[in-house]
A protein has these predicted regions:
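Bacterial N-terminal signal peptides that target proteins for export
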Residues: 1-10
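An exposure/low-complexity boundary signal
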Residues: 2, 20-23
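Bacterial N-terminal signal peptides
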Residues: 9-19
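An acidic-aromatic pocket/loop used at catalytic or ligand-binding sites
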Residues: 23-186
């Protein structure tokens, strides 16, 4: 009996062990986002279950009009499990301040590699980030107030991406959006 299970059991065990560092890293990132949600000056605007995506567009450059269509100057298309969160930042705190705290933790605690960052006008059009990239029109703010960070975590075969976007329409309307994409391993 044992010999018939062994060929099936060993590859499954090896697969699970190879994904263990990714699961730990992803779990830590989700814990970090949960810490954000639990802060008293944060109100959740949108949070859905993880969804499987194919060829999800990750911006690695400013959004600009190229041959009549809005798109990032540089990008990558990735597939995997995507989790999105959008929060409104309240009580005099700024979305940029919260973004910088999260970014600092990603770099310190997870050795996240920054693949692209922009602030203000260097990001391009805020309305395009809100509508085309994140499909959250509530994120539309002034171009000068926006910030975006794209991070890579993990190693080939067990990677994830974390995207952070902060915007502000006014002092009272500050928003932060986060996306975590756990990549397929093929």
């Amino acid at each position: 009996m044992r010999t018939t299970l062994f060929p099936w059991y060993l590859p499954l065990t090896l697969l699970l062990l190879s994904r263990a560092p990714l699961a730990a890293e992803a779990g830590g990132v989700f814990d970090l986002l949960e810490e954000v949600r639990q802060r008293p000056h944060v109100e959740t605007v949108a949070a859905g279950p993880a969804e499987t995506v194919r060829d999800h567009l990750v911006g690695l450059g400013a959004i600009e009009k190229i041959r009549g269509a809005w798109s990032p100057r540089d990008s990558e298309r990735l597939s995997g499990e995507l989790t999105r969160r959008t929060w409104r930042i309240l009580d005099g705190f700024s979305s940029a301040e919260v973004l910088e705290r999260i970014a600092g933790r990603l770099e310190q605690d997870f050795a996240a590699q920054l693949t692209f960052a922009c602030e203000g006008y260097s990001c391009g059009s805020s309305v395009q980030w809100a509508n085309r990239m994140f499909r959250q029109r509530i994120l539309y703010g002034t171009d000068v107030s926006q910030r975006y960070r794209a991070y890579r975590l993990g190693e080939a075969g067990s990677e994830l991406r974390v995207l952070l976007y902060a915007s502000a329409r006014s002092a009272e309307r500050q928003y932060l959006h986060a996306e975590v994409l756990v990549l397929d391993d093929h």
